[in-house]
Amino acid sequence: MEPAETTYVLGEVPPSEGGIAYRGAIPCLQMGFPEDAALPAVNAPLPISALTCADAPAMVALTDVAFPGFFRLRTCVMGSYFGIWHPASDPTQPSQLIAMAGERLILHPSREISGVCTHPNFRGQGLAAALTAHVMHHHRQTHARSVLHVVSTNDSAIRIYHRLGFETLREVQLHRLKRLE
């Protein structure tokens, strides 16, 4: 961890370490998609593109407005990410990343869906559901089971995940740690 950087640890309260401050817990639901269930359709209103680490600044910018604190520039190296871009009205300007989803934690045979977010100006169009379904199809192709973690108070995301077929497995604690210095 870099000085002043924050990270999150799943599970039990981590032991005290010099230079690391405990900043509290966030209750989350751990959800899983049944391995034998039919996959939901991917109904994206705009094309879905593979994202690379070259897109990391746009990915961080999106998460900073949609769900701050959980995505960093190097998170892109942890798995495959996909996004939906909104074309700029001025052709001389770059497109804007308006929604994304990917994977962060890979523990065979499970892969964690992560970074699911939509820019507030584009919510309600099914983008998060389409991207989540896209990642689920990607997982099925590699014989992986899709799992995810969602903050327990994020009712809209929980509804989307249930509609896609995810089942709640258990509640877990996500512990926030910050490096001092």
Language-model region placement:
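Acyl-donor-binding surface of acyltransferase catalytic domains
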Residues: M1-V42
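Short, high-confidence coil segments that cap the C-terminus of an alpha-helix
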Residues: A4, H143-R145
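Conserved beta-strand-loop-alpha-helix junction that forms the acyl-donor binding cleft
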Residues: V9-P14, H138, V147-I158, L174-E181
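Conserved active-site alpha-helix within GNAT-family acetyltransferase domains
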Residues: P14-I20, A129, S152-E171
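Conserved catalytic-core motifs of GNAT/GCN5-like acyltransferases
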Residues: R23-P34, E167-E181
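Short amphipathic alpha-helix that is part of the acyltransferase structural core
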Residues: E35-G69, Q93
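A conserved beta-strand-loop-helix scaffold within acyl/acetyltransferase catalytic domains
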Residues: F70-Y81, W85-C117
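Conserved acetyl-CoA-binding loop-helix of GNAT-fold acetyltransferases
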Residues: T118-P120, G124-Q141, I158-R163
